[in-house]
Amino acid sequence: SNNSSFLKNISKEQSKVLVRIFTDLMNKKALEAGCTNTHFVTPNGLDASDENGIHQTTAYDLSVMMSYCIKNPDFIEITKSSSYSFSNLDGKRYSVTNANAFLSMYDNIISGKTGFTADAGYCYVCAYKDENKTFIVALLACGWPNNKSYKWTDSKVLLDYARNNFEKQVLLDNIKTFNVKVTNGTS
């Protein structure tokens, strides 16, 4: 079809421009979500740099991104699926498998994203949700080759600790507001 021939005919330079446009949108969305120490250079998370610095984030910013994403029910449905099959516009079938093995290792995991680069090591961010609590785990540099399973073990330890040690507490109930006159104040 015309759509697939368009994609086949994109030059290397055009591809670079499209990646730049996409990562600019990713950086803008990260800022909107509340991330302050993230800079995307590649859409796939691979190590790279540009005139604004290296491709980087923090565990905190990953947790902010995951917290933002899980507000979208479609995002949760997609990311908690173990596999998915679809067709392109020409009717060719594809199947993808979710690399997030933790989905089947720990109850109530609603989303997660794995990652690995030589510089970053194994990284993982996931969201846990039960009837009362939601927890986000973000792990960076959680082992290098031969230690691929560390991210699962560490996620389990952190989630077990959170589930057993944190309860929702109401700090203020029936809050009353008052109008207070401030002399020489400005609004």
Descriptions of predicted regions:
Residues 1-67:
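Mid-domain, small-residue-enriched loop/turn segments at the edges of structured enzyme/sensor domains
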Residues 35-36, 53-187:
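Domain-terminus/edge residues, biased toward the C-terminal soluble/receptor-binding domains
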